Amino acid sequence: MDRCKENCVSRPVKTTVPFGPKRVLVTEQIPSQNLGSASSGQAQRVLCPSNSQRVPSQAQKLGAGQKPAPKQLPAASVPRPVSRLNNPQKNEQPAASGNDSEKEQASLQKTEDTKKRQWTLEDFDIGRPLGKGKFGNVYLARERQSKFILALKVLFKTQLEKANVEHQLRREVEIQSHLRHPNILRLYGYFHDATRVYLILEYAPLGTVYRELQKLSKFDEQRTATYITELANALSYCHSKRVIHRDIKPENLLLGSNGELKIADFGWSVHAPSSRRTTMCGTLDYLPPEMIEGRMHDEKVDLWSLGVLCYEFLVGMPPFEAHTYQETYRRISRVEFTFPDFVTEGARDLISRLLKHNASQRLTLAEVLEHPWIKANSSKPPTGHTSKEPTSKSS
């Protein structure tokens, strides 16, 4: 597929890298020689393996009278689910009118039932494919009892094992299932059978930010500032939970039904009890100097990526893009980039203060949100957003 990534799994779950873009992959260590160049002579963006979920624009709900297409998944042995849906947050489902006490008791009972629920493929009507990737597919789906519309990511165990990426899926499930923020894609639960792993995900009907960027070439200042505001809010939440994303890029950002930005693909994310790591990961265009140079890094890597993203939104290409990996590497290490004339002074100031070689000199997320250019151009971010999730059957 083209470019685009709560529980700790009770058993080792064979996992996957979501549907990544068809870009050149790089390994954990970037060789100092023979990095190669784009055969076409055009600049290429370089991608490390990641769990990118690419969900194209689709309708939020199935049309009136429209039934989901028959299951399009290959036949498999009887599902043997081992995991359950995460406990829904209180009041995530709208309550009907009636006796408050009885409704509260029913809600509590439903919550307990959901906690004990073990999902199988038979619980879902499977609709059209939303995306295809190296390790599986994403389908539009509907939970049969609640009629809740969602995205079902289906990953093939054999392909995950062959690529040795099970650990990335475990990490994605562990981290994403614990996060609750309006600008972070929800992972409601997961289950597996003999051949496949299934992730029950929030459906983002407007597709990826990357597709929007391709369609429009670049964004105006108002849209860019609004996206950066939403992203900064979401990253502040992640960092408060000691989670570093490490792979922020347009392919990993989805759009909800109201156009709100949602971070997806936590395959390269980490819980950071030490807050310092040395692993190389993510997309080369977005990697900060400390990561490509193999130095220790912390949550400030996400600040660098925020600056790169802001630049790409406004200009239509990343600031360090080059014809070869070596040149991109060199530009990042030296922080060599220029602004087109149409980029305003306020935007230049914000980006330049995020793209600092010394991580300690980068703006904090709080400072990003208070930056004059952001405050002057960002529309009010979505508020009061609560996500719903499928409910369990009555016993």
UniProtKB/Swiss-Prot annotation:
<keyword id="KW-0969">Cilium</keyword>
<keyword id="KW-0597">Phosphoprotein</keyword>
<dbReference type="GO" id="GO:0043161">
    <property type="term" value="P:proteasome-mediated ubiquitin-dependent protein catabolic process"/>
</dbReference>
<dbReference type="Pfam" id="PF00069">
    <property type="entry name" value="Pkinase"/>
</dbReference>
<dbReference type="GO" id="GO:0043203">
    <property type="term" value="C:axon hillock"/>
</dbReference>
<dbReference type="GO" id="GO:0097421">
    <property type="term" value="P:liver regeneration"/>
</dbReference>
<dbReference type="GO" id="GO:0031625">
    <property type="term" value="F:ubiquitin protein ligase binding"/>
</dbReference>
<dbReference type="GO" id="GO:0045931">
    <property type="term" value="P:positive regulation of mitotic cell cycle"/>
</dbReference>
<dbReference type="GO" id="GO:0046982">
    <property type="term" value="F:protein heterodimerization activity"/>
</dbReference>
<dbReference type="GO" id="GO:0007098">
    <property type="term" value="P:centrosome cycle"/>
</dbReference>
<feature type="modified residue" description="Phosphoserine">
    <location>
        <position position="50"/>
    </location>
</feature>
<dbReference type="GO" id="GO:0006915">
    <property type="term" value="P:apoptotic process"/>
</dbReference>
<dbReference type="GO" id="GO:0014069">
    <property type="term" value="C:postsynaptic density"/>
</dbReference>
<dbReference type="GO" id="GO:0009611">
    <property type="term" value="P:response to wounding"/>
</dbReference>
<keyword id="KW-0472">Membrane</keyword>
<keyword id="KW-0656">Proto-oncogene</keyword>
<feature type="region of interest" description="Disordered">
    <location>
        <begin position="376"/>
        <end position="395"/>
    </location>
</feature>
<dbReference type="GO" id="GO:0072686">
    <property type="term" value="C:mitotic spindle"/>
</dbReference>
<dbReference type="GO" id="GO:0098978">
    <property type="term" value="C:glutamatergic synapse"/>
</dbReference>
<feature type="modified residue" description="Phosphoserine; by PKA and PAK">
    <location>
        <position position="333"/>
    </location>
</feature>
<dbReference type="GO" id="GO:0005654">
    <property type="term" value="C:nucleoplasm"/>
</dbReference>
<dbReference type="GO" id="GO:0051642">
    <property type="term" value="P:centrosome localization"/>
</dbReference>
<feature type="modified residue" description="Phosphoserine">
    <location>
        <position position="40"/>
    </location>
</feature>
<dbReference type="GO" id="GO:0032436">
    <property type="term" value="P:positive regulation of proteasomal ubiquitin-dependent protein catabolic process"/>
</dbReference>
<keyword id="KW-0498">Mitosis</keyword>
<dbReference type="GO" id="GO:0000278">
    <property type="term" value="P:mitotic cell cycle"/>
</dbReference>
<feature type="binding site">
    <location>
        <position position="265"/>
    </location>
    <ligand>
        <name>ATP</name>
    </ligand>
</feature>
<dbReference type="GO" id="GO:1900195">
    <property type="term" value="P:positive regulation of oocyte maturation"/>
</dbReference>
<feature type="region of interest" description="Disordered">
    <location>
        <begin position="1"/>
        <end position="114"/>
    </location>
</feature>
<dbReference type="GO" id="GO:0035175">
    <property type="term" value="F:histone H3S10 kinase activity"/>
</dbReference>
<feature type="compositionally biased region" description="Polar residues">
    <location>
        <begin position="29"/>
        <end position="60"/>
    </location>
</feature>
<feature type="compositionally biased region" description="Basic and acidic residues">
    <location>
        <begin position="100"/>
        <end position="114"/>
    </location>
</feature>
<dbReference type="GO" id="GO:0010629">
    <property type="term" value="P:negative regulation of gene expression"/>
</dbReference>
<dbReference type="GO" id="GO:0061523">
    <property type="term" value="P:cilium disassembly"/>
</dbReference>
<dbReference type="GO" id="GO:0000226">
    <property type="term" value="P:microtubule cytoskeleton organization"/>
</dbReference>
<feature type="compositionally biased region" description="Polar residues">
    <location>
        <begin position="376"/>
        <end position="385"/>
    </location>
</feature>
<keyword id="KW-0832">Ubl conjugation</keyword>
<dbReference type="GO" id="GO:0051321">
    <property type="term" value="P:meiotic cell cycle"/>
</dbReference>
<dbReference type="GO" id="GO:0000212">
    <property type="term" value="P:meiotic spindle organization"/>
</dbReference>
<feature type="compositionally biased region" description="Basic and acidic residues">
    <location>
        <begin position="386"/>
        <end position="395"/>
    </location>
</feature>
<dbReference type="InterPro" id="IPR008271">
    <property type="entry name" value="Ser/Thr_kinase_AS"/>
</dbReference>
<dbReference type="GO" id="GO:0005814">
    <property type="term" value="C:centriole"/>
</dbReference>
